[in-house]
Amino acid sequence: LKIRASYGRMGDDGGASTYPQTAIAYQLDTDGKIGYIYNGTFITGVSATAIPNPNLTWYTSDTYNAGIDFDLWNGKLSGTLEVYKRKRKGLLATSSAVIPGTVGASLPQENLESDQTYGWEISLGHRNNIAGVSYWVNGQISATKNRWDYHLDGQAGNSMENWYRNDVSGRNKDIWFTYEEGGRFTNYDQIRYHNTTGANFGQSTLPGDYWYKDWNGDGVVNDNDRHPMATYNLPVFNYGITMGAEWKGIDLSMNWQGAAGVYNSYDEVFTEVGPFNGGAVLDIYTDRWHTVNATDDPWNPNTQWVSGLYPATGHSFSTGSTGIKNTSYIRLKTLELGYTLPKTWLVKAGIKNLRIYVNAYNLLTFTGLDNIDPERPGRQGLSLIHIS
């Protein structure tokens, strides 16, 4: 059993580049608005892009870590429990202070903001030998979150505006504030008599279009109805399992990998009839709401419709929850089968060791998504592997 703790401080140059703001930078005017007239001729001038800041420094990154390592019963059970935190100070930001236009340049970036990343990790392992078969199993799960300690917040106009802003001091980062899908219009009566106004409707609203919930109940769907729907960028949980076995030179190993509490935006894929810049395959194009007869008038309330996955002509409100999908998954990343030839077979050939093996990658994926690779960052995320 081992108990450990550590602390470290280092400089972090992430995002700082070469600090061009430490010197005055100029740009050539291309609009003919800045310059001087000499002998009746306009001479193009240059303008300062920012006031220099010679006091910029790297971020300061403080890292804290504590953990417990254990190994029991001669290695039959081992594991690690760990918690960690990284606090960064001096992140670059530009002050919102107002300066007169006569200054002729914008304010420079300063070391103003701070944030932290924190989380935990648990790993467990087991190995044994039973009746000549040796095997091992290792599992790992971790959770990570990001949080602003201090963010240069602009002044909110009211409490609602402060509520749905993402980058606010003391709040976790990367929260998706958006409109919650309530369903789909299936006929013109639903469109005509729906009990909300605002963003749910437009002149082109048709059966098959999505509608969004009036979250605050004021009868109007607008920015005040946005609320936390998901997180993005980092999964809440990452996990993996590796296992293997060996018997008389035959070995089999596999590696499973997954994530949970992770969301991606597939606006184009789920809300447009012709995704991928109009290059969608025919099956995607035809699986949409459409009139029974191609010549029927879609604006006639008596027209009959055939339902499908996609709206008839797409939906302008693609920023709602319709395109945001839970991309939690577990995937068989690698599978390998091998055989190590006995050394007695190899001596005469002068070979010390010889192992023959076959392996495969990304054989199986279990996820709630259909036809989309959950590891794809979003947008054009069609998958070419087996999805269950």
Model-found features: residue ranges?
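Conserved small-residue
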Residues: 17-19, 113, 129-233, 273, ...
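Glycine-rich, aromatic-lined ligand/substrate-binding cores of catalytic
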Residues: 233-265
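Glycine-rich, charged/polar anion/phosphate-binding loops
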Residues: 50-52, 225-229, 236-241
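Acidic side chains
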Residues: 69-71, 82, 90, 209, ...
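Active-site-adjacent bridging/hinge elements
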Residues: 38-45, 93-98, 216-221, 305-314
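Extracellular/periplasmic, surface-exposed regions of secreted and cell-surface proteins
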Residues: 1-171, 319-388
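Extracytoplasmic gating/loop element in the C-terminal half of outer-membrane beta-barrel translocons
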Residues: 199, 259-350, 354-355
